[in-house]
Swiss-Prot record:
Top-level division of the source organism's lineage: Eukaryota
This protein's name: Glucan endo-1,6-beta-glucosidase B
GO cellular component terms attached to this protein's record: extracellular region
Keywords: Carbohydrate metabolism, Cell wall biogenesis/degradation, Glycoprotein, Glycosidase, Hydrolase, Polysaccharide degradation, Secreted, Signal
Classification lineage: Eukaryota, Fungi, Dikarya, Ascomycota, Pezizomycotina
Length: 409
């Protein structure tokens, strides 16, 4: 998905901006958290200054499985998605409930703690319904008022010197069936139609304009045009051949109309070919500004034997290359559901294993452009999905460079 010194020495000069390459980014206090040596050196140093980030999961697109207490406190118990909750509560009550959630799930203290833990990037999942005039008032039900809270989070992260990826996590019509991460529990994916692509493209234009014109978005350098589409190349063919190139054209035309110079363009991110939706570059005429997202959940890889040494070994040799540049934008320490609570895998008594496995995965993903863990926090009582809890448990070190001292491989 994005950035490292070789990326910028081998490509043409007109490039999307990346921190420490095209321009440095600083916290409000003047600190450059990507550069620990000097202001003039390149940011991405092997084993030190790759992308190291966390997802703000369940902030703007709530997934009830990982935020059950918050979901219940909002009055949404028993509802499967944001769409269902808003429909059940009614618009006015839902808007207040969601505003309370947005104001408390991720705070400025969280952002500051991320920096203290050595993180330099956040990925923010959002839904198309942030642009409220895209929502069909007679048939769609989503909370209103989220954009101001997105501005706040991006402002805090920019003030802290962090890099920001905004990800279209919930697409019009839903890009996957029966998945709350789309914002609705649709029986079938309705995204793969021209009129839905048009709505998504309008969202991307609006988001691009907001990023370039609102100072709180100043450290947003990447816009992902859809998260986790269907893993079926035939079903996704119109997305690859129509929506992707149209997204590039519409985003670049928007930037040109705003007078944005090429070194300040956004990176445009797509799921990589490993995801299974097809080759994202197939119909692109210019991919110099492209970046790629890889989601690596070993727990769902049936080719890896379910024992600790196999998990470590698989991660040690895990090559996430292919489309380039790639960031591993989602991963975790979770293991298969049928063993996750057994003695061999129970979190509290196996911290040494999970620390080794975290190191093995992070080192592998830093052979690409870095990683973004899913997620910063969860309400599962299980650090395998919660970066914050894993640090508290001693599984993830605050000094992330020390993972190379673990020698897990």
């Amino acid at each position: 998905m994005k950035f490292i010194l070789p990326l910028f020495t081998s490509l043409p000069v007109a490039l999307a901006w990346l921190p420490g390459i095209d321009k440095d980014i600083y916290s409000a206090a003047g600190t450059n958290i990507f550069n620990v040596t000097s202001a003039s050196s390149k940011r991405w140093l092997p084993a030190s200054k790759k992308i190291r980030g966390v997802n703000l999961g369940s902030h703007f697109v709530i997934e009830p499985w990982m935020a059950s207490m918050a979901w219940s406190n909002m009055g949404c118990s028993g509802q499967r998605s944001e769409f269902d909750c808003v429909m059940a509560l009614g618009q006015e009550t839902a808007d207040q409930a969601f505003a309370d959630h947005w104001g408390s799930w991720i705070t400025q203290d969280d952002i500051n703690q991320m920096v203290q833990y050595g993180l330099n990037t956040i990925r923010i999942p959002v839904g198309y319904w942030l642009k409220e005039d895209l929502v069909y008032a007679d048939s769609e039900h989503f909370p209103k008022g989220g954009i101001g809270y997105l501005e706040d989070v991006c402002g805090w992260a920019s003030d802290a010197g962090m890099y920001i990826i905004i990800d279209l996590h919930g697409a019009p019509g839903a890009q996957q069936p029966k998945q709350p991460f789309t914002g609705q529990y649709a029986p079938n994916p309705g995204f793969y139609q021209d009129y839905q692509y048009d709505r998504a493209l309008e969202f991307l234009e609006w988001m691009t304009t907001s990023i370039h014109q609102n100072n709180k978005f100043r450290n947003v350098g990447m816009l992902e045009i859809v998260n986790e589409p269907v893993q079926n190349a035939d079903q996704a063919s119109s997305m690859i051949n129509s929506y992707y190139p149209s997204a590039f054209t519409r985003i670049r035309n928007t930037e040109s109309s705003l007078g944005i110079t090429s070194n300040n363009y956004l990176h445009i991110q797509m799921m990589n070919e490993k995801w299974g939706s097809g080759d994202p570059t197939q119909s692109l005429t210019d991919n110099y500004f492209a970046a790629y997202d890889d989601h690596r959940y070993v727990k769902w890889d049936s080719s890896v034997a379910v024992d600790k040494e196999s998990y470590i070994s698989a991660s040690c040799v895990d090559d996430r290359g292919g489309n380039w540049p790639t960031i591993v934008g989602e991963w975790s320490l979770s293991v298969p559901d049928n063993v996750e609570h057994t003695a061999d895998w129970e979190p509290s008594s196996n911290t040494d294993f999970y620390a080794r496995w975290f190191a093995a995965q992070a080192i592998a993903y830093e052979k690409q452009e870095g990683w973004v863990f899913w997620s910063w926090k969860a309400q599962l009582g299980d650090y395998r999905w919660s970066y914050k809890d894993a640090v508290d448990a001693g599984v993830i070190p605050k000094d992330l460079d020390s993972i190379y001292d673990y020698s897990p491989c």
